[in-house]
Amino acid sequence: MVNLKIDHNEISVPEGTTIMEAAALAGIDIPKLCYLKNINEIAACRVCLVEVAGKEQLVTSCNNKVQEGLEILTNSPRVRVARKQNVQLILSQHDFKCATCVRSGNCTLQTLSNDLNIIDLPFKERVEHAPWDKNFPLIRDTEKCIKCMRCIQVCDKVQGLGIWDV
């Protein structure tokens, strides 16, 4: 077992546990957009950042394993600022018209944006407008894509097809 502190709570978790999994075992939810256990653990969204005592850089919690004696903060001011900036960057490349979206009210990105109190974007919007290929049997709306890689990983690892790319 590995002993560590998450948000000042002492916990013990099995070796090989990720910081995100350890936090969940402690009842702490770390926000995430791209994470799918055992399928997509690449930290593409950078939303799951946490602060680790003694480390200068914030670290992603979905793909970093716990170590003995770590002291982790999941919601420090530094983490909140970085998380908000990362979501704002994602939104700057996303069709940010939630009111007319079919997923409105059932969207992790929308919920996270609301939780982070994101009202406007400090970055210039760059939404990719690519026409749909009506001859291809699957539909992918590039204006909604947040480049999380989930669809690509599920297609590769679950379906074994490998037909998607960003």
Which sequence ranges carry the predicted segments?
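Extreme N-terminal starter segment of soluble prokaryotic enzymes
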Residues: 1-3
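Short strand-turn-strand beta-turns centered on an Asx-Gly dipeptide
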Residues: 6-9, 53-54
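Charged, low-complexity terminal tails
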Residues: 32, 36-39
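Short, structural beta-strand-to-alpha-helix junction motif
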Residues: 17-21, 65
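Fe-S ferredoxin-like electron-transfer domains
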Residues: 46-166
